[in-house]
Amino acid sequence: MQHYHFSHSLLAQQEKPYRFPCPAKLNLFLYINGKRQDGYHELQTLFQFVDFGDWLDIEVREDNEICLTPELPSLKNEDNLVYRAAKLLQQKTNCALGANLTLDKILPMGSGLGGGSSNAATALVALNYLWNTQLSTKQLAKLGLMLGADVPIFVHGHAAFAEGVGEKITYCEPKEKWYVVLKPNVSISTATVFSDPDLIRNTPKQSLEQLLNQKYANDCEKVVLNHYPEVEEILHRLLQYAPSRLTGTGACVFAEFNDEESAQLAFQTIPKNYFGFVAQGLNKSPLHNMLAKIS
């Protein structure tokens, strides 16, 4: 299992292309407070990164071409968030440089782990560094929001409490627990979950302090379990070991443990026909840890 570990000497000697992490995220809780007139939902959610995810290899080109490999089976390159992020940064900064981008995709799509958003954020943050385009984190987050609601969280690179439609962000320091994360063999459309008439949409807003000091939950869970028995089955299995719930709109579920040994013991009992991993929660993104060491 590949986790993100960096030493200063390793990075100093790193050959091109540079290799940047795109960590997964978990929604430790997710509450839906209402639906706005524009169709978007008001949320309160707590994001934390985990020490596991995709990789993006980047080689700077002297021309302004953006080349992304490999092309994902279900997605044209022009629609891939990595490609779109690179083009957006290039256009907004009038950068004359280009890049060869190679995405090592480990996280499944439609999983609730934020893989696509993390890929886009890594492209923005890493290219801003390599191209020396000198945008601030705030400016990069603004570009990220044009690509997806979760992208700014990954751009900021810090565990955070998000409100509204995800645009109001408060940095947070939840406990860095160990997680078993599993994905049943289904993909779930976020739009389908949010349009379901049975979705809870009226959870009262609470302060961050109140939310952090009560049992965590996910308002999307009931709808997802009703429609996807595979998710229900895997969640029940995890609940035998530890507090467990859905992340985002699924399909992934996670169980939280206080130490790695307990998490590994539970993980070893799970049938191997699921995508899954054990990883520690991180309040600072591995991407930002890496950049802090090489800049």
Curated annotation (Swiss-Prot):
Sample GO molecular function, one term: 4-(cytidine 5'-diphospho)-2-C-methyl-D-erythritol kinase activity
Gene Ontology BP annotations: isopentenyl diphosphate biosynthetic process, methylerythritol 4-phosphate pathway; terpenoid biosynthetic process
Species annotation: Pasteurella multocida (strain Pm70)
Record's protein name: 4-diphosphocytidyl-2-C-methyl-D-erythritol kinase
This protein's pathway: Isoprenoid biosynthesis; isopentenyl diphosphate biosynthesis via DXP pathway; isopentenyl diphosphate from 1-deoxy-D-xylulose 5-phosphate: step 3/6
Residues holding ATP: 108-118
EC number of this enzyme: 2.7.1.148
Classification via InterPro entries: GHMP_kinase_C_dom, GHMP_kinase_C_sf, GHMP_kinase_N_dom, IspE, Ribosomal_Su5_D2-typ_SF, Ribsml_uS5_D2-typ_fold_subgr
